[in-house]
A protein has these predicted regions:
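Non-catalytic, glycine-rich low-complexity segments
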Residues: 110-146, 151-154, 190-196, 513-521
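Extended acidic/polar, glycine-enriched regions
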Residues: 141-209
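Surface-exposed loop/edge segments in extracytoplasmic proteins
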Residues: 145-152, 570-578
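Active-site mouth of glycoside hydrolases
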Residues: 196-414
């Protein structure tokens, strides 16, 4: 405490000492205090309110700070997305408090906390006149040391302007808002990004060129499903879908922002993304409630550790609402708004479109513009793909992170799935390979056995696959579109596959011999997965091919292995007795030194898992 400090303060108030325990301490500058006191629309963290309360006792005449309340019903300091928020109106301090505070050099802490890869949200009150969606520009620059990143904000209705930030790095961060509206410009604050909790592994990213991993390095083995508009079916059905997902093996779900008009899906959504009514929407005015609900469902998925693969545009409108034929200006405004709202959610992936080539009002140049816009406006660089109908998009474009492909034929036979890897040099996700079901359309009536077969084909090729289900239902609720409950037999078998994937090498499974033994994948020479598919042999000669150059080390004489027989349909694991020791057979294979074979049950859908014994 500086000498000569007025006796009205004395020592640091007890409440302030307690609130600061364990927090990083920083010296509050004169400029910061001036901003805190005079700025009627400033921002503050939840903890700022906590430590500012004891200051009321410093001067008897100091009124309580007036906290700006939100009209929303959730608890102060949190919004429906469960994120830390910052909101405070500080102009309640009188001049006496100002003099005391300016005379002090207390190392006060004004920071809030958010997990690394979590979401920190700044909310300010701002203009409501005119059209805030068009008239007001709002963003914030977040900084740590010499590094900074500018994040676009958005208008959320009722005078609320928000900007959301997901810190990549732990430690102290600061921010300053940027706006053409005086009351929103130049507001500053700080917070601390803390160690992530046990279930927070960060966003999923590309790893080892063809695979995925969370930001903390934990492997992510994609096992997705499709449920196009489950999020627009009302709370009862949506909660049922979430309950089903919680018990499923799926760790990614594809779904749309816009409503869908298609067979078995002709009901109107509970609300619309824009102000107005069908065929008479004002696309310059968004409906914040619509997007708040979308965010709620994204967070629900995050709690289930499921990635949200969000389809931004689609052709299933047919003029019902006109969202498939918006102008370039309307598209761009909408896309910027969605990215500003959702990019900070760590489980978000972007899909520019479902069956992009079926959108007859868009050209290839439009998609290039849209891809660059979404990529360029996303400060957190979430995964981004574009899904095809009959014509593959140019998946080599630099803004595409992974190839999202519809092609059932690619996984219907051995040796096909890996070809796209060579062409695109990116992770290959067969998001649509037809659907398990019994509807008349040829894309919607493959068997559960065929669905599981296609997943395994994708797996041994070093690629990934997507599930869907279209069983007829009197209530018109088909999983592929509306969600609800799963009726098919493939999910249980895919859960078995998930256990196999979880036990596989972290680097990902690679094809081992695409020229000859295409049913073998793995990570040579330590792990092999042999999938025999629809064949039903009674034995398999134990022999391991050498991998392609650069795809692992070749097997060598003396290496020892164990083996297990996996029944991928009946979901059983049977260990094989003994140890297999390698001896060179020819220029391409090493086989068991005693020429042993593995006995098999003579049924289809059998796999063999082979693991090297470390010596």
């Amino acid at each position: 405490m500086k000498k000569g400090l007025p006796n009205t303060i004395g020592t640091i108030p007890t409440g302030l000492q307690q609130s600061a325990q364990g927090w990083p301490r920083q010296r509050t500058t004169l400029g910061q205090w001036v901003r805190y006191i005079f700025n009627p629309n400033g921002v503050a963290s939840v903890n700022e309110r906590r430590w500012m309360q004891p200051l009321q006792g410093c001067v008897a005449s100091s009124p309580s700070p007036r906290v700006a309340r939100s009209s929303q019903p959730w608890a102060e300091g949190f919004n429906p997305a469960g994120v830390r928020t910052a909101r405070l109106n500080r102009h309640g301090f009188v001049a006496t408090s100002i003099a005391i505070l300016l005379a002090s050099s207390l190392p006060l802490h004004a920071a809030d906390f958010v997990e690394q890869w979590g979401m920190y949200e700044v909310t300010l009150k701002g203009p409501t006149n005119g059209n805030p969606f068009l008239d007001v520009r709002f963003a914030a620059r977040f900084a740590q040391g010499y590094d900074s990143i500018e994040v676009p904000g958005f208008y959320d209705g009722d005078g609320n302007y928000r900007v959301r930030f997901s810190p990549e790095i732990q430690g102290a961060w600061s921010y300053e808002t940027l706006s053409n509206a005086k009351e929103l410009n130049g507001k500053t604050g700080d917070f601390t990004a803390t160690k992530p909790s046990a279930d927070n592994h960060g966003p999923v990213r590309v790893a080892n060129m063809y695979h995925f991993a969370y930001a903390d390095g934990k492997p992510y083995k994609q096992l997705g499903t499709t449920c196009y508009v489950w999020n627009l079916q009302g709370d009862e059905l949506e909660e049922q879908t979430l309950k089903t997902l919680a018990a499923s093996p799926f760790n990614k779900i594809r779904f749309c922002v816009f409503p869908k008009r298609y067979q078995w899906n002709t009901n109107e959504p509970p609300m619309y993304p824009f102000v107005g009514r069908p065929r008479n929407f004002d696309t310059t005015r968004f409906n914040p409630s619509y997007f708040q609900h979308l965010e709620k469902r994204v967070l629900d998925l995050q709690r289930l550790r499921i990635e949200a693969d969000i389809i931004l545009l689609h052709p299933y409108d047919d003029g019902a609402w006109g969202f498939d034929r918006m102008t370039a200006v309307e598209d761009d405004r909408y896309l910027k708004y969605v990215v500003a709202r959702l990019a900070a959610f760590r489980n978000v992936w972007w899909s520019l479109a479902n069956e992009y080539d079926f959108m007859k009002f868009k050209t290839e140049d439009d998609w290039e513009r849209i891809g660059q816009l979404v990529s360029g406006n996303d400060p957190f660089h979430r995964l981004l793909g574009i899904h095809n109908g009959k014509v593959l998009f140019n998946q080599t474009r630099p803004w595409i992170t992974h190839a999202s492909i519809q092609n059932g034929a690619a996984v219907a036979e051995f040796g096909r799935a890996e070809i796209y890897r060579d062409a695109f040099r990116k992770p290959i996700v067969y998001d649509e390979v037809k659907y398990e079901g019994d509807i008349e359309s040829r894309w919607g009536h493959i068997s559960a056995e065929e669905m599981v077969f296609r997943f395994w084909n994708a797996t041994i090729a070093g690629t990934y696959c997507g599930h869907g289900e279209t069983y007829k239902s009197d209530d018109q609720i088909l999983w592929w579109s509306k969600g609800g409950v799963l009726k098919g037999q493939s999910p249980a078998r895919l859960a078995f596959l998930k256990k196999v994937l979880d036990d596989s090498p972290a680097e990902g499974i690679e094809f081992v011999d695409k020229w000859q033994d295409t049913p073998i994948g793995g990570h040579a020479p330590d792990y092999y997965l042999v999938y025999l598919g629809k064949e039903a042999p009674t034995s398999w000669e134990f022999k391991l091919p050498k991998p392609p150059q650069g795809k692992g080390q070749p097997p060598a004489e003396g290496m020892k292995f164990t083996a297990e027989v996996l029944d991928t349909w009946n979901m059983t694991v049977t260990p094989v007795d003994g140890v297999f020791t390698l001896k060179k057979k020819d220029n391409y294979y090493h086989a068991d030194k005693d020429s042993r074979s593995i006995a098999l049950p003579g049924r289809p859908y059998i796999a063999i898992r082979i693991k090297r014994i470390n010596q």
